[in-house]
Amino acid sequence: VLSRRQRQMCIRDRIKSNYQNFMIQKATELGVTKFLPIIFDRTVVRKINKERLEKIVIEASEQSNRMNVPSIENPQTLDGFLKKNSIDLIFTDINSNTIKVDKLKLTDKPVCIIIGPEGDFSEHERDKILSFKGVQSVKINENILRSETAVISAISIVNYVIN
């Protein structure tokens, strides 16, 4: 683990299985402690194969010599997630006003990175996320990235800022 600070990550409910497996594996290797699947407005498949994902995080934890295995939470709505979490929220949205990575400010709260759904966030979701206390909207690249690339990039940026 790169830091003792607890890190979390939000992922959308479902992407193609092999891409999701890769994303979960790499995020585990990079130190994510918890996966929080969110059901967005444009989520098509609302179920995850939790057993399969748990197997992936165990294998990735062993491969990277992690002492702890990340947990995989049950899918939840965006509203439910925002209401019950006290976090530093990093919103990776190419369409909103963003800060530069070097301006990212993190507190002692857990960090949660929101990576959007394939069809992008709805305006309603974007507004809801941007109104969350403690949210920081960060552009991680000039180009629109595939989800698995965005996850690796965003986690690497957070690891850099934390350490």
Segments and roles (model prediction):
Residues 123-163:
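Structured adenosyl-cofactor binding patch, chiefly the S-adenosyl-L-methionine
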Residues 1-11:
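Single conserved hydrophobic/aromatic residue that forms the stacking wall/gate
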Residues 40-43, 142:
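Short, ordered loop/turn segments at secondary-structure junctions
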Residues 27, 57, 141:
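Residue-level signal for inorganic ion chemistry
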Residues 12-21:
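Short, glycine-rich nucleotide/cofactor-binding loops
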Residues 46-117:
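S-adenosyl-L-methionine/SAH cofactor-binding core of RNA-modifying enzymes
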Residues 28-31, 130-131:
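Non-catalytic positions within long, well-ordered alpha-helices that form the structural scaffold/packing
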